[in-house]
């Protein structure tokens, strides 16, 4: 059974304590009424995993855990079988005691693009919105963050996160809550807020930016990564039924338009720090994610376009400050 008591105890002693006015009731409601039909199966998988304290843990360059003595072939096979029960694995990769989880996304590449532009994360309390399996939260801890809190309503991601955490010795420096940002009160408590790969899924992108701002302390930093298209400050793509086979894509602005949106929401010191085309090396089918991936969503005769004829995925990273 996945338990949030450790997180409640942790925030009871810090500047997130006011969250306890609403959070336990929300989680209790989720446990009672909103659990996925496969959640028990997934959470049982986490229960069956051994809790291992890493002898060597590298979160700075990767998410890699090693034991002092190599695990037996049987132990490795058991861990691998259990982790495969939590497929598909989309965000990673993870290297855990000889089990190498080759995820759909090379999320480490994104982190390498983002990290050089961030304010020093040392000692910071961080919110990661739409955090997936939590890969980037572990990298935030590796970069010196005091606490990383992720929110993502996808319950498989919660179980993937808890599985990795258990194999990292039940590390309590990162926590994932099965919530969407619209369920958070205006906490105004995080030094840095990340929203990566979320904005284009929101029906109201400016409302999302306001919600992100409401989570930041004054002078806090927003890290926003999202799909963009080429164009000036007035360019926004509103796809039809699907974009790259995704139904839930609503607005894809140019990076300059996105900069204006941030300005309209009251952010300052807005910087476009990276723009790059997503490649089929960065997002692809693997043994740990065996269904369709990016190559299936692009025009086979012209990979600069999606199968629907839109520009192929390009992503920008913007950094801004809440005054």
From Swiss-Prot:
- One GO BP: tRNA wobble uridine modification
Keywords, ordered alphabetically = Transferase, tRNA processing
This entry's Enzyme Commission designation comes to 2.5.1.-
List, in alphabetical order, the Gene Ontology terms for molecular function in this entry: transferase activity, transferring alkyl or aryl (other than methyl) groups
Residues the record lists as binding carboxy-S-adenosyl-L-methionine: 91, 105, 110, 130, 152-154, 181-182, 196, 200, 315
Class of enzymatic activity (EC top level):
transferase
Give the domain of life.
Answer: Bacteria
What's its catalytic activity?
Answer: carboxy-S-adenosyl-L-methionine + 5-hydroxyuridine(34) in tRNA = 5-carboxymethoxyuridine(34) in tRNA + S-adenosyl-L-homocysteine + H(+)
Checking InterPro entries in the record gives: CmoB, Mo5U34_MeTrfas-like, SAM-dependent_MTases_sf
Question: Entry's CDD domains?
Answer: AdoMet_MTases (cd02440)
Q: What is the recorded function of this protein according to its Swiss-Prot or TrEMBL entry?
A: Catalyzes carboxymethyl transfer from carboxy-S-adenosyl-L-methionine (Cx-SAM) to 5-hydroxyuridine (ho5U) to form 5-carboxymethoxyuridine (cmo5U) at position 34 in tRNAs.
Protein family (similarity comment): Belongs to the class I-like SAM-binding methyltransferase superfamily. CmoB family.
| Quaternary state and interactors | Homotetramer.
Q: Which HAMAP family match?
A: tRNA_carboxymethyltr_CmoB
Report what the protein is called: tRNA U34 carboxymethyltransferase
Q: What gene is this protein a product of? A: cmoB
């Amino acid at each position: 059974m996945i338990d949030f008591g450790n997180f409640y105890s942790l925030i009871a002693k810090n500047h997130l304590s006011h969250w306890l006015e609403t959070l336990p009731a929300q989680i209790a409601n989720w446990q009672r009424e909103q659990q996925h039909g496969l959640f028990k199966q997934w959470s049982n998988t986490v229960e069956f995993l051994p809790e291992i304290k890493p002898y060597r843990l590298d979160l700075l360059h990767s998410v890699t855990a090693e034991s002092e003595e190599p695990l037996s072939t049987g132990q490795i096979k058991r861990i691998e079988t259990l982790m495969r029960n939590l497929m598909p694995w989309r965000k990673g990769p993870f290297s855990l005691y000889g089990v190498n989880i080759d995820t759909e996304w090379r999320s480490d590449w994104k982190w390498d693009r983002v990290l050089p532009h961030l304010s020093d994360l040392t000692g910071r309390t961080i919110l990661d919105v739409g955090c997936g399996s939590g890969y980037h939260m572990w990298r935030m801890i590796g970069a010196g963050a005091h606490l990383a809190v992720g929110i993502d309503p996808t319950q498989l991601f919660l179980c993937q996160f808890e599985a990795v955490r258990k194999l990292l010795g039940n590390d309590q420096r990162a926590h994932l809550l099965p919530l969407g940002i619209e369920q958070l009160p205006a906490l105004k408590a995080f030094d840095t807020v990340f929203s990566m790969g979320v904005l284009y899924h929101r029906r109201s992108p400016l409302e999302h930016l306001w919600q992100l701002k409401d989570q930041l302390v004054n002078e806090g930093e927003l890290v926003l990564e999202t799909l963009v298209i080429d164009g000036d400050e007035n360019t926004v793509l509103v796809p039809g039924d699907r974009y790259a086979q995704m139904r839930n894509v609503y607005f894809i602005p140019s990076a300059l338009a996105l900069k204006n949106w941030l300005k309209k929401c009251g952010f300052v010191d807005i910087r476009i720090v990276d723009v790059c085309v997503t490649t089929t090396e960065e997002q692809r089918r693997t043994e740990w994610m065996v269904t369709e991936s990016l190559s299936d969503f692009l025009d086979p005769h012209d990979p600069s376009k999606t199968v629907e004829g839109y520009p192929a995925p390009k992503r920008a990273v913007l950094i801004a400050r809440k005054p």
